[in-house]
Curated annotation (Swiss-Prot):
GO MF entry, a single one: pyridoxal phosphate binding
Gene from which the chain derives: dapL
EC numbers for this chain: 2.6.1.83
Modified residues (N6-(pyridoxal phosphate)lysine): 250
Family: Belongs to the class-I pyridoxal-phosphate-dependent aminotransferase family. LL-diaminopimelate aminotransferase subfamily.
CDD domains: AAT_like
Subunit comment: Homodimer.
Protein name: LL-diaminopimelate aminotransferase
Organism annotation: Bacteroides fragilis (strain ATCC 25285 / DSM 2151 / CCUG 4856 / JCM 11019 / LMG 10263 / NCTC 9343 / Onslow / VPI 2553 / EN-2)
EC category name: transferase
Pathway, per record: Amino-acid biosynthesis; L-lysine biosynthesis via DAP pathway; LL-2,6-diaminopimelate from (S)-tetrahydrodipicolinate (aminotransferase route): step 1/1
Length: 410
């Protein structure tokens, strides 16, 4: 008989955002006339940039002619997009990449979840806490996370590095050696960042301990302050210890279109049990050729348009719109006496719940009293207890109204 992967049975009954959806749906059934403002899940609301739409229309037209029709594309991505990525996202920062080091995908979530395919199941894992749930869940699925302690909410083979107000949301460098470390900056969910000096400490640690850093830079386009690195490869030596994930979802509104990319440097290696060094670029390329058929041509043409002068201008307008939302929300929440972190270099606000209220309790208060949906911080890890995450991706009027409700009703 067929046997299941029993590691899946270790996962909590449902995904965080599924639990939120169930609570919201229950509220809607019992309060059908209430107008709910959703500031929880980080989905965007602004339309795609005009440059991307025009590029997609043109690509669709190409599909109508035998001379310009495109079928299967390269699993790694089309050269035209990869070259645009390198020219615009890396070369201006003094980072040299080969086209074969960039892998176009259908969004950063896929690759951050799948990168473990090329890594042994018994590697030790380190995560900042709180953390994007996909990092933990994907390691549980392959057996790498160990056993869940239901009381603490922690997995036995995962080292948790608390990010709290007390340490300014800067994770301490581990005292012990860890095989794989996940870093996400600008951070989801806290909206905080690391300076170059702080990120350099992690690169130095990784080089000294033969640690692999999985660096999620999905929100780098929102960085405003000058000393915040946009790429881990701005740090000397990072190509020898880090894989970087990028996404067009929040940069250009591609949450429904689906496109991003992963950088796996050729000089990055990991070891076999016998000590042989294996290039991870080679393994990831092999994995993609087997399990991924590439991102669609139409989508990649849309992504290429992001890097045109018109595309850059339109994208910046959208990013400015969301960051203005973040400022309005941050100021509104602080005016009520709430302590708010993030919202400066990222579209997320990490809000301390009042009077020691638990994350889920404050979620319920916001939903039932203000009819505003956030995300309970504890859903991102044990150190998220006592916080709630709000996103700035809503419509301007909704953000303003949500702040009014929170101020007047809570």
């Amino acid at each position: 008989m067929a046997l299941v992967n029993e590691h899946f049975l270790k996962l909590p009954g449902s995904y965080l955002f599924s639990d939120i959806a169930k609570k919201v749906n229950t509220f809607k059934i019992t309060h059908p006339k209430r107008d709910i403002i959703r500031l929880g899940i980080g989905d965007v609301t602004r339309p795609l940039p005009k440059a991307c739409i025009e590029a997609m229309h043109k690509a669709v037209e190409e599909m109508t002619s035998a001379e310009t029709f495109r079928g299967y594309g390269p699993e790694q991505g089309y050269d035209f997009l990869i070259e645009a990525i390198i020219k615009n996202d890396y070369a201006p920062r003094g980072i040299h990449l080969s086209p074969t080091e960039v892998f176009v995908n259908d969004g950063a979530k896929s690759d951050t979840g799948n990168i473990g395919d090329i890594l042994r199941h018994d590697n030790s894992v380190g995560v900042t806490d709180p953390i994007y749930p996909v990092y933990i869940d994907s390691n549980v699925m392959c057996g790498r996370a160990g056993v869940l302690d239901t009381e603490s909410g922690k997995w036995s083979n995962v080292t948790y590095m608390p990010c709290t107000a007390e340490n300014h949301f800067i994770p301490a460098i581990p005292e012990k050696r860890i095989d794989i470390v996940y870093l996400c900056y600008p951070n989801n969910p806290t909206g905080t960042t690391l300076t170059k000096a702080e990120l350099k400490k992690w690169v130095d640690y990784a080089l000294a301990n033969d640690t692999l850093i999985l660096f999620d830079a999905a929100y780098e386009a929102y960085i405003r302050e000058p000393d915040i690195p946009h790429s881990i490869y701005e740090i000397k030596g990072a190509k020898k210890c880090a894989i970087e994930f990028r996404s067009f979802s929040k940069t250009a509104g591609f949450t429904g279109v689906r496109c991003g990319y992963t950088v796996v440097p050729k000089e990055l290696t990991a070891a076999t049990l016998e000590g042989e060094r294996i290039p991870l670029n080679r393994l990831w390329n092999r994995r993609q050729c087997t399990k991924f058929n590439g991102t669609s041509y139409i989508t990649q043409r849309a992504a290429e348009a992001i890097y045109t002068p018109e595309g850059k201008e339109q994208i910046q307008e959208t990013i400015n719109y969301y960051m203005t939302n973040a400022r309005i929300m941050k100021e509104g929440l602080e005016s009520t006496g709430l302590k708010v972190y993030g919202g400066v270099n990222a579209p997320y606000l990490w809000v301390k719940t009042p009077k020691g209220t638990s994350s889920w309790r404050f979620f319920d208060q916001m939903l039932y009293e203000a009819n505003v949906v956030g995300t309970p911080g504890v859903g991102f890890g044990p150190s998220g207890e006592g916080y709630i995450r709000l996103t700035a991706f809503g419509e301007r009027d909704d953000c303003i109204e949500a702040m009014r409700r929170i101020k007047n009703r809570l």
